[in-house]
Design a protein with these regions (language model features):
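Cytosolic regulatory regions of ion transport systems
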Residues: 1-3, 7-9, 14-185
Length: 185
């Protein structure tokens, strides 16, 4: 017998929202940062058929990504207005700032909003900044700020809490969890 039960979680995280935004919708997306994270995001979104522009100050990283994926590569500082305009910010639906520096990511999102980008997502790893994420999101107009280490820790903790679960689904931005377990007869 299989039992499905629900649980409300009052600590909501951003980890699933990103996927729901993109599902079944063509978007023009700018990714600032061509490191491991930025490259992985570009690769995934490229497979889904989105129009991608990547921006990085490292010529080699931009060139490698532009030659391996169907993306527009721009060499330059993704925190500057002119470079974002060159990458297509005036028509972009989403900017994802995934450089190694939180300050660059936040400033890139601020400049992207000024250039007309609809939604912005910043990778923010510094715990001092993550404590103020709600204020940062409100004042900078961020759609989402993600701390990958914190998100991974939360996900591991969630899986350990329900180690016998066959399936765990989150709804309502992580506030509600639906858990599927097998109950012995």
């Amino acid at each position: 017998m299989t039992l499905v039960c629900g649980r409300v979680n009052f600590f909501s995280g951003p980890h699933l929202v990103f996927k729901y935004w993109l599902r079944g919708k063509f978007m023009r997306i700018i990714i600032v940062g061509c490191g491991k994270v930025g490259s992985s995001i570009a690769s995934e979104l490229n497979l889904e058929g989105h129009e991608i522009s990547v921006v990085d100050i490292n010529h080699g990283a931009v060139d490698k990504l532009a030659n391996s994926l169907d993306v527009l590569g721009i060499e330059g500082n993704g925190a500057t207005y002119d470079v974002l305009i060159e990458a297509g910010a005036e028509y972009a639906d989403l900017l994802i700032a995934a450089t190694a520096r939180d300050e660059i990511n936040l400033y890139s999102c601020l400049m992207a909003k000024a250039a007309g980008v609809t939604h912005t997502i910043a990778r923010v790893r510094n715990p001092e900044y993550t404590n103020d994420l709600y204020r940062i999101k409100e004042h900078l107009g961020l759609s989402m700020a993600i701390n990958p280490e914190q998100t991974a820790a939360n996900e591991i903790s969630r899986l350990l809490r329900f180690s016998g679960a066959l399936e765990i689904d989150s709804f309502s931005k992580g506030v509600v969890e639906l858990i599927k377990v097998t109950v012995p007869q």
